[in-house]
Amino acid sequence: RAVFVGDLVDRGPRVVQASRLVMRMVSEGNALSVPGNHEETILRCLQNGSQQGSAGTMKTIRQIQALPAAARRRFIAEFRSFVTALPPHLVLDRGRLAVAHAGIRPEYLGRDSLEGRRFAIHGQTTGEIDRYGLPVRVNWAADYSGKALVVYGHTPVGAPEWIGRTVNIDTGCVYGGKLTALRYPEMKLVSVKAGRVYYRPRRSLPGGIGLRAETRARPGAAGLSVAARPQSPGARPRSGPARPTAPRPAPAGRTELSME
């Protein structure tokens, strides 16, 4: 089955079609998904009737508003039901694998709490703003000590980024980068190049992609930057922690974790 890591909406040219595809896959039992912060943003705008937001958010709202009235009402109702029913994170393969949009700490795994939900969907920031006007993110992955392999996204990187037993597979597809999936339990990364740049961000990823790896910092170390260098999908990072040894789960069907 496919497992979607969130941020299915915003900035892309066919948000409604993409959302319908994922909702159908999940309802038919062919996929699982966790919510991203962009799903929450769009849902909030639809509920409040807001006409203000980022350029990417309003692009999505316009696509939804362009639907015929009956189709628009049906889509909004289905989207609301879908997003609100999603778990903030997934624990799979008897605890060997975890999936969360922005990551997860060991103490939140398998537990339902407001703090854990907020972390899984939005991550954690230092409270500081970088020179691009974006929040400086806490590098939670560097301190992760859990047994489960955590697959996440949220912060675009130039290439899949392994840090200990975590891997970030958000490789900036919407910014002209790649759409990346991790085949599990094979531990094989598969990437497909974006057809074009769909959205222009404020800064660029390594290798000339539209968005650079977001500035991150450990608590008390503001400004620490962790950036992945461009490399072949599945290659061992050229700097930073080595790729971890693949977990050896009980035999099961293949799971693909993907994100746009």
Predicted regions and their residues:
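An N-terminal domain-cap segment
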Residues: 1-14
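Residue-level marker for buried hydrophobic side chains located in beta-strands
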Residues: 2-4, 33-34, 98, 151, ...
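Divalent metal-coordination and catalytic microenvironments
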Residues: 7, 36-37, 60, 83, ...
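Short, glycine/acidic-enriched loop or turn micro-motifs at the edges of active sites
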Residues: 10, 39-40, 104, 157, ...
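Active-site neighborhood of divalent metal-dependent phosphoester bond hydrolases
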Residues: 11-91, 119-121, 125-132
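Short aromatic-enriched loop/helix-cap "lid" or pocket-rim segments at secondary-structure transitions
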Residues: 44-48, 109-113, 204
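Hydrophobic, aromatic-enriched interface-forming segments
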Residues: 79-111
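Acidic, His/Gly-rich catalytic cores of divalent-metal-dependent hydrolytic chemistry
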Residues: 116-230, 234-238, 243, 254-260
